[in-house]
Amino acid sequence: MKVVIYFLIGFLLSFRLEAETIKIGSLQYGSVNWELKLIKELELDKKNNFNLEIVELASKNAAAVALQGGAVDLIVTDWFWVSRQRSEGRLFSFVPHSMAAGGLIAPKDSNIVNDVDLKNKKIGIAGGQVDKGWLIFRAFYKKKYGEDLLKLSKPIFGAPPLLNKKIKQKSFDAILTYWPYQAKLLTDENFEKIIDIKDILSELGIPSGMPVIGWVFKEKWGEKSTEIFKNFLKASDEAKQLMLESDDIWDDVRPFM
């Protein structure tokens, strides 16, 4: 009888541990991955009573497909994507993650002084045609000048690391990229920021401090996984706070960058 009881206890414990695993899809080159890796490195998931499984993906589209197909529980994406999905009857939810955004970067010798100089220019765009930065920038340009940048310029879409490499090779006149890759380029004195996405949001009348990206998940998953999600958000906040307050913690983050 004792053997049976021990077996049942072991089975229930293993089931409980499996139920507390949260799978998060993350871009290999994204800053979200830094945070998730730090959570694992410091065992903040164990501290907060869940197990984090990081599923590294190659692109934003791959992340969306993984979430829709149930391969992961969470991804980070923008509220444009969530809004579109919900309008088509696919119920995804959004919890704010970050207000960080990128911007338009150009070589100092490119003759691009401001956004009006983009006509017929080859622009590298991080992500795809429905990426938040590109949609925001197009809306801003349309409002300001009455023209669509999609038709006015020559956009080419690609992964941020590749865009950084290509603009240094003068393959682009400018790139619209995410903030970590913007920051890397701006350490090079040959490049400058033309306009920031945050400034564009302000021009469009969107309140300052509005998070652009967030944790996105199926509504049904959120309803049945409230506790583990709260635990994850707590670990996420702890990781962010450590990165904000400690210079030393970046030594742990650096290998993932």
State each model region's role.
Residues 5-14:
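Bacterial N-terminal signal peptides
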Residues 12, 43, 140-143, 252, ...:
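Generic structural signal for isolated residues within well-ordered alpha-helices
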Residues 15-19:
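Sec/Tat signal peptide C-region and signal peptidase I cleavage site
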Residues 21-157, 169, 173-179, 194:
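Short, glycine-/small- and polar/acidic-enriched structural segments
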Residues 79-80, 156, 160-256:
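Pocket-lining segment of extracytoplasmic ligand-binding domains
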